[in-house]
UniProtKB/Swiss-Prot annotation:
One MF annotation (Gene Ontology) recorded for this entry: water channel activity
PANTHER family per record: AQUAPORIN TIP2-3-RELATED (PTHR45665:SF37), AQUAPORIN-8 (PTHR45665)
Domain notes: Aquaporins contain two tandem repeats each containing three membrane-spanning domains and a pore-forming loop with the signature motif Asn-Pro-Ala (NPA).
Primary location recorded for the protein, binned into one broad class: membrane
UniProt-listed SUPFAM superfamilies: Aquaporin-like
Distribution of this protein across tissues and organs: Roots.
Places the protein is found: Vacuole membrane
Descriptive protein name: Probable aquaporin TIP-type RB7-5A
GO process annotations (BP): water transport
Cellular component aspect of the GO annotation: plant-type vacuole membrane
Keyword tags: Membrane, Repeat, Transmembrane, Transmembrane helix, Transport, Vacuole
Length: 250
């Protein structure tokens, strides 16, 4: 059963919620600054050469490390979403209300945009790369790729962070989330760019003024994240039986 809740203005504007929005803004800004910054650095060091295997690994590792840190520094305040697709997936499973999730989206999009504006400034106007599908692929193929890899990301978020049965597994949630993002960039980077995150794609599109393929990075991640939220949050967690207690073995 889907457990979506709209929420209330009072809850979404509580002190705790306002702190969460600020935490999402800061963490997303730092993540995008490092992630997009690694792509800009690669282009500068190679004189805008085509991405090679070593460059792909470097960009994937930068995103994985940055997300690991971003989730870690925001986890105790906002849950460490840093991604509208993660927020939607958690909303589908009843872990955050729609209204509060909407303000998370705003914070994440603003964080990404400010990060890219800062990168544009500190690099003295170097081009901010945007996501786009590879030559020879169409938009639908890009959407399907983003659905699959975002599903993997949000499924990992549920398994390691949101599942009430996670136990000690929760301690590795940030690094597991960073690992799946890095792995997915290695797999999907040469094809769709491996975004998994509408905010990660939105900021560069704003600063570059190029929204020609940005819809792909909204449609794919939101579908994939929502599907993972439904399957894990509503089907699996919704059917959980209580964990056995010590008395059950007495």
């Amino acid at each position: 059963m889907v457990r979506i809740a709209f929420g209330s203005i009072g809850d979404s504007f509580s002190v705790g919620s306002l702190k969460a929005y600020v935490a999402e803004f800061i963490a997303t800004l730092l993540f995008v600054f490092a992630g997009v910054g690694s792509a800009i650095a690669y282009n500068k060091l190679t004189a805008d050469a085509a991405l090679d295997p070593a460059g792909l690994v470097a960009v994937a590792v930068a995103h994985a490390f940055a997300l690991f840190v971003g989730v870690s520094i925001a986890a105790n305040i906002s849950g460490g979403h840093l991604n509208p697709a993660v927020t939607l997936g958690l909303a589908v499973g009843g872990n955050i209300t729609i209204l509060t999730g909407f303000f998370y989206w705003i914070a994440q999009l603003l964080g990404s945009t400010v990060a890219c504006l800062l990168l544009k400034y500190v690099t003295n106007g170097l081009a901010v790369p945007t996501h786009g599908v590879a030559a020879g692929l169409n938009g639908l193929q890009g959407v399907v790729m983003e659905i699959i890899i975002t599903f993997a990301l949000v499924y990992t978020v549920y398994a390691t962070a949101a599942d009430p049965k996670k136990g000690s597994l929760g301690t590795i949630a940030p690094i597991a989330i960073g690992f799946i993002v890095g792995a997915n960039i290695l797999a999907a980077g040469p094809f769709s760019g491996g975004s998994m995150n509408p905010a990660r794609s939105f900021g560069p599109a704003v600063v570059a003024g190029d929204f020609s393929q940005n819809w792909i990075y909204w449609a794919g991640p939101l579908i994939g994240g929502g599907l993972a939220g439904f399957i894990y949050g509503d089907v699996f967690i919704g059917c959980h039986t209580p964990l056995p207690t010590s008395e059950d073995y007495a």
